[in-house]
Curated annotation (Swiss-Prot):
Species for this entry: Homo sapiens
Protein name in the entry: Mesoderm posterior protein 1
GO MF entry, a single one: DNA-binding transcription factor activity
Domain bHLH: 82-136
Main location: nucleus
Gene this chain is encoded by: MESP1
Residue ranges, annotated region (Disordered): 17-93
Amino acid sequence: MAQPLCPPLSESWMLSAAWGPTRRPPPSDKDCGRSLVSSPDSWGSTPADSPVASPARPGTLRDPRAPSVGRRGARSSRLGSGQRQSASEREKLRMRTLARALHELRRFLPPSVAPAGQSLTKIETLRLAIRYIGHLSAVLGLSEESLQRRCRQRGDAGSPRGCPLCPDDCPAQMQTRTQAEGQGQGRGLGLVSAVRAGASWGSPPACPGARAAPEPRDPPALFAEAACPEGQAMEPSPPSPLLPGDVLALLETWMPLSPLEWLPEEPK
């Protein structure tokens, strides 16, 4: 009698608690003609390790985050459309302003440059305006070369004033202004030094009574008597070696009016 190729399985192994219907049996020690591991259908169940996709049920709930994502997308689309609309409005306003400015510029172009019935683009209008302005500058002698030539001529002639047609940064005008500022500073320093020298030499202050007094009135007379005592005699100050006589006379006779002389004259 022929022996079976595979030994019979023991009943204890088949009824073992460690191996259920979802477990696969271990392979036998001997090589059988066919594999003991057959398809899952032969065992009547699927392996526990293999994931099985459960079919979708008709009553299942959706993810709660899905509606919020939809609302956010709708809101962002509305914001984007509003921003695009505002940008379009700004661009339209800018183009209208530019067209209005070019229309005003074309009004100043003569018919010989821009005929009345001829339509011009923005670039053509700007080019014609530039050419017309250059032509007027050349006719009036206001070109850059003419202005520089005039500045050089006036600078060589030693004119004290700058060229009235030149801008503020004209070389001749800047040189003239620098010389005038230097002379003014020198005069100011000389006057300040003269005043300081006169004060250091101690020339006595002038008395208001020495000047030609106005009509005799009581308050000025009292002020003059208080300022110049009877025993004090006004003597001319000695000439200073640092100041000429006319400067000293001017400094001695100059004095601000007294507060009493500021009062208005009473009607008689």
